[in-house]
C-alpha cells in the first residue's frame, strides 16, 4: 500500500466479508494446528485442514464424582450434537486395537490403566475420522492431573470443560439406587428415574461397587484428584450443580457447549434494537453510544434532520410530514444508506432503532449490505408500556418533561398547566403496540439469531444484558 496516498480508507465490504466468513478465526485455527502438528509440508496440511471444515465441532470434557450424572449428560449431549461419546469402557472394548488389548489385560489384573496407555488410547481414538469430522465428548477423562497434562502436550485441547458437583450425601444416595440397561447403556434409578416399560425393568442390572462404603471411597479419591485437574483448564471451565433435575443440568451444559469463547478477531458492532413503542430502545441506544462510541442512528430522527437541513432528501420527505403520512420505504432506505456509509459508522459501528418495522424493510436493509451482527428484541407487556407513556406530561412554559408517577411536578401550579402529547394517548399507544407485535413474529424469524431481552426491568439491568450479548460470541447453531 502506497504510504504517500494516506489516509487509506478500507472499503466497508472487506471487513464485512471477513466477519461473515470468519476469515480471522479460520486463519487463527490454521496457525494453531500448524504449530501443534508442525508438518513437513505446511501447504498440504492446511489444504487438508480446510477440507475437513471441522473448526466448530464439539470438543468437550465432562468431569464429576460418581453418581453426579456425567455419563447421562454426556450421552444426551452426544445425541443432540451428533458427536462421539468416549469413555474409559468404550476405549477398552475397541476392536482391532493393539493398545486396547494391552490395556484390557492390564485392567483385568490391576483394576486400573497406566496413564501413558490411557492417554495413548485417547489419542488413537480422537485421531480417527469420525472424531475429526463430528467432534468428541470425553466422559470422566482425564482422571488425574498427569493425564490432563499429557493430553494437552499432544495438542488434544478441549474447547469446553464441564464439572458436575453435588453434596456427597446426595451422591451416595443416588449411587445405591443406580441401575444400568445392558442393551442401551442407559442409566436408571430405583427412586428418581425408574423406566415405565416392564421390558426394560426386567433387564436392568445393578452395577458393581455401588455400596455406601465403596462409593465413599471413590468420592474421597475423586476429591483428591479433581482439585489438581481444574487448574489445567482455567478459561474454559464451567461448574454446574447436579443436585437438580437432570433436564436442567443438561440445558445448562448444552447452553455452555454451544457458546463460543471470546476471540481476538476484529469486531465492529452493528446493533439493531427492536421493540414496541416505549420499550426503551432510544435509551439503550444512547447508553451503547456513550460507552462504546457507536453511532446512534434513530430512523425517525434522521428523517427530521433531513427536513430541517432542507437537503434533497428533506424536500422529498417534507410533504409526507405535512400530510402526516408514512414516508415510503424507498426514501427511508436512501436516507439510512447515506448515513450508514459514512466513515464514522464504518469505523466505530452503529446502533439502529426505529427501522426495520416489518419483514420487507428488513430485507431491504439486508439487500443494501447493512445487515446487523447483533439483534435484540426488547419485550415489554402492554400494561408497562401504558404506565410509561400515558403518564408523561410536558410543561409548556419551561419545556420540562414530567411523569406523574416517577417524576411528578413540584407544585400544583405546574401540574395544572401540564399538557399531554397526543402520541401519548392510550388509543394511539395500543394501536402502535398492536402494529409492532403483528410484524414482530416475521422479524424474529428473519433474524433467527436475535436475542430476546426482558425490557420490563431497570434500564441499567437491560443494558447489562444487551452489553453481554454484544461482547460475547453468539451461540453456534446445531446442524
Swiss-Prot record:
Region of interest called NMP 2, as start-end residue ranges on this chain: 298-327
Stretches the record annotates as LID 1: 177-206
Pfam families on file: ADK
Alphabetized CDD domains for the sequence: ADK, DD_AK8
One cellular-component annotation, GO: sperm flagellum
Residue numbers spanned by region LID 2: 391-424
One biological process term in Gene Ontology: ventricular system development
Gene3D superfamilies: P-loop containing nucleotide triphosphate hydrolases
Residues where ATP 1 binds: 67-72
Coiled coil region boundaries: none
Keywords tagged on the record: ATP-binding, Cell projection, Cytoplasm, Cytoskeleton, Kinase, Nucleotide-binding, Transferase
Binding positions for AMP 2 per the UniProt entry: 325-327, 354-357, 361
Binding site for AMP 1: 140-143, 147, 203
Compartments reported by the entry: Cytoplasm, Cytosol; Cytoplasm, Cytoskeleton, Cilium axoneme
Enzyme Commission (EC) number: 2.7.4.3, 2.7.4.6
Chain intervals for the UniProt region annotation (NMP 1): 87-113
Record-listed ATP 2 binding positions: 278-283, 392
Protein family per UniProt: Belongs to the adenylate kinase family.
General function of this protein: Nucleoside monophosphate (NMP) kinase that catalyzes the reversible transfer of the terminal phosphate group between nucleoside triphosphates and monophosphates. Has highest activity toward AMP, and weaker activity toward dAMP, CMP and dCMP. Also displays broad nucleoside diphosphate kinase activity.
Subunit structure: Interacts with CFAP45 and CFAP52; CFAP45 and AK8 dimerization may create a cavity at the interface of the dimer that can accommodate AMP.
Protein name, entry field: Adenylate kinase 8
Origin species: Mus musculus
